[in-house]
From Swiss-Prot:
Subunit architecture: Part of the 30S ribosomal subunit. Forms a tight complex with proteins S10 and S14.
Function statement: Binds the lower part of the 30S subunit head. Binds mRNA in the 70S ribosome, positioning it for translation.
Family (UniProt): Belongs to the universal ribosomal protein uS3 family.
Record-given protein name: Small ribosomal subunit protein uS3
Keywords of this entry: Ribonucleoprotein, Ribosomal protein, RNA-binding, rRNA-binding
GO molecular function ontology, one term from the record: rRNA binding
HAMAP family: Ribosomal_uS3_B (MF_01309_B)
Gene coding for it: rpsC
Highest taxon listed in the record's lineage: Bacteria
Length: 295
């Protein structure tokens, strides 16, 4: 179901792309996957205050390219680029290959699901009321162009004894629609009462596919195959020859007799009656009473 499954994984083959893009055979796949997880955990701890939205890992031939999407690129780069150089050395040591690190700026962090979740968890750790933090984030997202947003918080909210779950939604969030561009992010708040989990769904509109445009091509083909339908039945005129009179009009009387004007006959037969010559049988001459022959 669309409400239960991860929205990113649900749309991977349609409108989303993978966050790790490389190929490995069966022997090397597990090791490379473990390296990716290790790198992501390291960047999560190292760049905790840099507002990192997502990390893209690519592995061309015997190299690695890591793209970091951040709302605060200056924190990642550091003074005169010192921090990013140290980051490259550490990542190269972990992966064992040369690493190129690229920084991409997130223009609107208010409508990025991961950054919204991180912002709410930071406020929860500062003992701000969870309802106030959630509603403020929703207002900012809708104000900056999001078509819909849903936020869910789970755990010992406000320090209550029994954990519960609360969620709020504004706008529309169509999780079942595959062409819908749904941004999904999660985060955890480490509070004195325990962990509070935050999930965020942001609806940004419909998309026509990934960067290669395969989704747009599929939609165009489907539209061409769809044949146009004719007008509605009640919009057609009622004076067609193969149809009767309009609805509500008086009907002509029916009977077994033929019409007097010959309208039931073909046009040629009806017109031929005017030029026909009537045949009159000539009567035989009457015989004489005395039986004599007349000349």
């Amino acid at each position: 179901m669309g409400q239960k499954i991860n929205p990113t994984g649900f749309r991977l083959s349609i409108s989303r792309n993978w966050s790790s893009r490389w190929y490995a055979n069966n022997r090397d796949f597990a090791g490379m996957l473990a390296e990716d997880i290790k790198v992501r955990e390291y960047l999560k701890k190292k760049l905790k205050n840099a507002a990192v939205s997502r990390v893209l890992i690519e592995r061309p031939a015997k190299n690695a390219r890591i793209t970091i999407f951040s709302a605060r690129p200056g924190v990642v780069i550091g003074k005169k680029g010192e921090d990013i150089e140290a980051l490259k050395k550490e990542l190269s040591r972990q992966l064992g290959v040369p690493v190129a690190v690229n920084i991409e700026e997130v223009r609107k962090p208010e409508i990025d699901a991961k950054l919204i979740a991180d912002s709410i968890t930071q406020q929860l750790e500062k003992r701000i009321m969870f309802r106030r933090a959630m509603k403020r984030a929703m207002q900012n997202a809708m104000r900056l162009g999001a078509l819909g947003i849903k936020i869910m918080s789970s755990g010992r909210l406000n320090g209550i004894e029994i954990a519960r779950c609360e969620w709020y939604r504004e706008g529309r969030v169509p999780l079942h629609t595959l062409r819908a561009d749904i941004d999904y992010g999660t985060s955890e708040a480490q509070t004195t009462y325990g962990i509070i989990g935050v999930k965020v769904w942001v609806y940004k509109g419909d998309t026509l596919g990934r960067n290669d445009g395969t989704g747009a091509k599929m939609i165009e083909v489907a539209d061409e195959e769809r044949k146009p339908r004719g007008p509605r039945r009640d919009a057609r005129p009622g004076d067609r020859p193969d149809r009767g009179a309009p609805r509500g009009a008086p009907r002509a009387p029916r009977g077994n007799y033929a019409p007097a004007d010959g309208s039931d006959k073909p046009a040629e037969a009806a017109g031929a009656d005017n030029n026909t010559v009537k045949r009159v049988r000539k009567a035989a001459p009457a015989a004489a009473a005395d039986g004599a022959k007349t000349e």
